[in-house]
Design a protein with these regions (language model features):
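C-terminal substrate-binding/active-site "lid" region of AdoMet-derived donor-dependent transferases
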Residues: 170-233
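Conserved class I S-adenosyl-L-methionine
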Residues: 83-94, 155
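N-terminal auxiliary segments of SAM/dcSAM-dependent transferases
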Residues: 1-51
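A short, conserved alpha-helix within the catalytic core of class I
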Residues: 161-169
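S-adenosyl-L-methionine
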Residues: 114-162
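Conserved SAM-binding loop of SAM-dependent methyltransferases across substrates and taxa
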Residues: 95-106
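Conserved SAM-binding loop and adjacent beta-strand
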Residues: 58-74, 82
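Conserved SAM-binding motif I beta-strand of class I
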Residues: 108-113
Length: 240
């Protein structure tokens, strides 16, 4: 178990028995710490103990690239109905945000990452998320193992060769299973749609993910003009 220690806008991940050293003082997380406890440093400042949830892990995971945004994860779960007990095959682990979220809702996940260093980071992130026993991070190319992979409820892809895997979706998925392809470019989405058609998948849709925060002040209310609301494109299809 890893806890989030919170003081104002400061947050730190620590496990029981580990020490936290900041300018606010030093403290050691007790072995019997529980969410809601207040821990005091030797200088008298307090930190509140929280159990990390998905958004906290997104903020604190070590990153190996641009991770999937929580809004994209939400769409994956919403469009596919991913749930506890599902078997998920994921390719393009990266930081492991999607794999961790799916593991935390109770799915059993097998995720492939080609880069050995990225895979090692993802395994540590799974440990921080508490899903190291249900998320199997494998180093390698999923296309090399497709002949031995079957019986999955959900196939999620964030790789350049995703269309190649989409064509094999009928061999990988159970009847009624879903495949989701995340692509940063429209061309990748088009290729995924064409591959889904070639594989006789149904209910094929593509969605651009855009989110805008709202700004409220004395002058009025409007969408925040800072930042970029667009993240990418999600193509969803189903095997009958």
């Amino acid at each position: 178990m890893t806890f989030l220690l919170v003081h104002g806008d400061r947050e730190y991940l620590r496990a029981p028995g580990e020490e936290l050293q900041t300018d606010l003082g030093v403290l050691t997380v007790p072995d019997d710490a529980e969410p809601g406890d207040r821990l005091e440093t030797h200088l008298g400042d307090e930190f509140v103990v929280r159990e990390p949830r998905g958004p906290d892990l997104f903020d604190h995971f070590e990153r190996t690239g641009a991770p999937m945004m929580p809004r994209d994860v939400g769409l994956v779960v919403g469009f596919t109905g991913a749930a506890a007990g599902d078997r998920v095959l994921d390719a393009g682990t990266g930081t492991g945000v999607l794999a961790a979220y799916l593991g935390r809702i109770g799915a059993d996940v097998v995720t492939y990452e080609r880069d050995a260093e990225f895979a090692a980071v993802a395994r540590e992130n799974m440990r921080l998320a508490g899903v190291e026993t249900t998320v199997d991070v494998r180093t390698g190319d999923v296309t090399d193992d497709l002949d031995t992979l079957a019986g999955f409820d959900l196939l999620t892809l964030d790789t350049e060769d995703a269309p190649t895997v989409v064509r094999r979706a009928p061999d990988v998925l159970v009847s009624g299973g879903f495949v989701v392809v995340y692509s940063p470019f429209v061309e990748g989405s088009r290729a995924a749609v064409e591959a889904a058609a070639a594989a006789d998948l149904t209910d094929v849709t593509t969605h651009e993910t855009i989110q805008r925060s709202m700004q409220f002040d004395d002058r009025g209310s409007r969408p925040d003009t800072r930042g970029v609301g667009h993240t990418g494109y999600l193509t969803v299809a189903r095997w009958e």
